[in-house]
Amino acid sequence: MGISPILEAAYGVDGEANDRCEAGRSGHISGRRPLSLTRLQPTPRMTPVPGKRIDIRVSQPGAAGSDHEPTFPPYDGPALFSFGFRPFFLGAALFAGIAVPAWILIFAGTVGSNFLYAPREWHVHEMLFGFLPAIMTGFVLTAMPNWSGRTPLRGVPLATLWGLWLAGRLVVAMPGIGPVAAVVDASFLVALAAIVWREIAMASLWSRMPIGLLISLYAVANMVFHVLALRGAATDVAERVAISLILILLTLIGGRVTPAFTGEYLREHNIPSPPAVFSRLDRLSILFVVVAVLAWIAQPEARVVGVLFVVAGVTNIVRFSRWRGWTAWREPLVFILTVGYGWMALSLLALGGAVLGVLPAANAVHVLTSGAVGAMTLAIMTRASLGHTGRPRHADLMTVVIYGLVNVGALFRAFAPASGAPAGMANVLLAVAAIAWSGAYLLFAFAYGPILVRPSLED
């Protein structure tokens, strides 16, 4: 099978479709056409049919699919709550811009803290189970109408879900409310999983079950984190499960959109030698990641786990080198995907090095969470925000600065503290990393916030 059911769910395309085809333009919120995450992919168009796969066959670049698309009831509420990517991308960006500098101030002892959990647990929880789920939710809620053919979550239901996410951020920052805070926070991912499973059931999209399973596992990991933290126990296993799910998602989704958009760019600019199509090497690289993370969850200190991570890293480096992503450097909106996937492959090597005792574990984890997650999420957030609001898919100067900041922050956070600098200098380097990384998200909120709160240019 050329593509996993997870990606079929996210993009609504058959796994055997030509790997270089890109699912087409989707509609906007006025009721004329549906808005979907596949707006990220400019051509060809496709027709969502509830309960059925959309089988796209492309015989040559530029071939077009169907122009017939389902019509949704008109929406006349606030633009911010017209589609899931709007409130959740904006909320995640603002939260990252606040939470990361707050953590550095606490870590350096500049300010005190009085959170539900110890400062380190608060930071880990809010990045893994607060910030990332917001972006995940924006992604999924925008993709669902495409693969279900049903009206998207919008208006009051969407605002309620966003409010539940926000409530989770508030209660976890409060002391003394223990189980109540845990229930409030955990209910968000449970609600998201329920929404996804409802769409799967209502449209009989059983082939899309893996995406519901992954979100459900993420929700369970969050609940396990709360149970362990409330008991004063180590939360390592919940953290490893969450990080493992992130690695799998980045390998699958990044491994699909990166060559697709790179290939589109190369075709548009008549550059020969397109990215390699999905092959046995891609399957093996995904398999090695899955095997490595499963072993890591079970036996985090076993040397064989370190070897598995290194093998997974090497195969994924070979994998993404075949996509020729460097040839798209003139369009940062495309090139940032290659950078993000490169961070992901590097994080596998770093995790292997950590298990083998070569690198500090915190540095290895931040290669993934600061580098791969930072670059890939902002790549998706910027491209989706432009495409779904009727704007050209081109990175302006502000967007290039956003990409630069997040990568500079990731470099400082992932490697500088391991450079042997004195403690005082290490704190300075961490502060620089936090300012750059969180600054990228604040700049996204500043530059893209007006886009996200206003109607599409096509309305």
Question: How does the language model describe each region?
Answer:
Residues 7, 29-36:
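Compositionally biased low-complexity segments, especially N-terminal hydrophobic helices
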Residues 11-14, 18:
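Acidic/polar hotspots within intrinsically disordered regions
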Residues 15, 24-27, 31:
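Small-residue-biased low-complexity repeat regions
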